[in-house]
Each structure stands twice: as structure tokens, then as C-alpha cells.
Amino acid sequence: MCIRDSLSNEDWWAQGYSEPGAGSDLASLKTTAVDKGDHYLVNGQKTWTTLGHHADKIFCLVKTDLNVKPQLGISFLLIDMDTPGVEVKPIITLDGEHEVNEVWFTNVKVPKKNIVGKENEGWTYAKYLLTFERTGIAGVPYSKSALNHLKMISKRSLKNGKPLIEDPIFSSEIAELEIDLLAMEIFNLRTVSAAAEGKAPGMESSLLKIKGTLVRQKTTELLRKALGPQALPYLPEQFDEGWNEMPVGPDYAGPIAKQYFNMRKISIYGGSNEIQKNIVAKASFGL
């Protein structure tokens, strides 16, 4: 039922992993699910829940055993967002947008059938899912599109009366960015090809996440540089239907500041880049 409705877009899912005291150290999460016979009673809080205010359901990591090593007492639970006791509160991010949320659970009754796999083995399932999430966070298609946008803006923006793209320092930064992106795309295709054969991405997803987020952040940084002061104003209303006022600067400058600030977070979510470096070091060198 869950898979069918997800594939048909009838259900929108949110992810309930991070908590105020459990981000990079996710295993220290405090949300509990107490066995009450035919259901679990869930209490706790999740944070940074992306688009949780639109979600129909949320898959959560919850503590089902407090007497064992943290990773061994975690279960993977599916919860309907309209269940009594579930409350969503907005978090306004640095770019002024409402994209993420806090989700509170107060005596939420969840049927026992909503557990995924076996009780207390949720940590294993979550780690597996995160390898695919990190591969996606690399965002190769996004970066390719943003790079083309950067080249267009660099041709239109002037420096000392000449197109910015003719500036040797700036053009070399674009070239370095494109080289990094091409190398990352090849590595990404290799990783996806292996996944199509049934192999989990593993350490490769961590490498992609590290490099991909740095490329995405660098792209928005160069876009901001290319536009100069015109990148500063952000007027979301100028994208509304029927808005006829004169934009501040060229129309393509509108979302640049928002994108720049929003991209600061991507090296943190999905497992911070510092954590990913630890994963790579452990897998490669046994550190």
C-alpha cells in the first residue's frame, strides 16, 4: 500500500531523522516508541523536517529499547501525519523561506504493523537509505544547469567595459568548476550503474556528497560574484503571477541571493561533510 501510493504520488513522505540533540550524532536520538500491545505510543521531537508541512506520512527513527547500545535500540516506524498528537511547526531558514519544520509527537498511537522490518534494526535500514540520499544530494543535474546559467550571466555582466567571462581570473574559476563537475558526473554514473546492479553505494555516496555539495556551493558563490550588488535584493513577490513592477536589476538576478543562502546548508544535511570524511577515512584506511 505504501509503495503503491508513493509511486502514484498520492502520498508525500517526510523524513524523521534529525532531532535537536541528534544531528551528526544521530544515534543519540530521544524520540521513543513504547510497545503498548497492538500499537506503539510515540513521544518526542524531530527537526529540520523538509516539507513536513506538506507531507501525508513520515518515516521515523525511534527508540524502542533504552537498555542497549544506542544503535541497537532504534526502530524504523511509519506514521500518518494526521494522527492525533502530531504537530508541525515551521522553521524559517536563512533565505527567508519555509522549507523545513519541527515535528512534535505527543502520545501518538501508531499501529504495530507500521514498523519496517524488525524491531530494533532501524539503524541498519536508515544507514542504507542514507547512502542513496547522499548520492542524490550531490545534485549533478542541478549543478550542470546552474553552470550554464553562470556562463550566461558572465557573458552579460561587464567588468571594466568587457564581459566578465573574458576576465582571466573569473573564467579560470568557471573552468575549474566545470572540470570538477565533469569528474563528479563520471563518478556519479559509475555509482548509479553499480546501484542498478544491486550494489549499495557505500563509501562512494560519501565522496559524492562531499564533492557535490562543494560544487553546488561554489556555483552559487560565483553566481553571486558575477551579479555583484544586483544579487543582493530578493523580492519573492516578483515571481508571482500578475506582478508588474520593475524588478531590481535583471530578472535573472531575482533568485540568486536566495539560492546562495539556501545552499549553505547542503554540506550539513544528509550527514555533514565532516562525518562523510570520517566514513571515507574508515572505509579506505581503517582509521
Spell out what each predicted region is.
Residues 125-132, 136-140, 230-287:
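Glycine-rich phosphate/cofactor-binding loops in nucleotide/flavin-utilizing enzymes
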Residues 159-162, 182-245:
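C-terminal helix-coil-helix/basic helical segment that borders enzyme active sites and/or dimer interfaces
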Residues 31-34:
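A structural signal for short hydrophobic beta-strand segments in well-ordered beta-sheet cores
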Residues 86-184, 266, 282:
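Glycine-rich beta->alpha junctions and the first turn(s) of the following alpha-helix
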Residues 1-5:
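Conserved small/polar residues in nucleotide/adenosyl-binding loops
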Residues 9-18, 61:
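A short, Trp-centered hydrophobic/proline-enriched beta-strand micro-motif
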Residues 39, 43-89:
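A short core secondary-structure module
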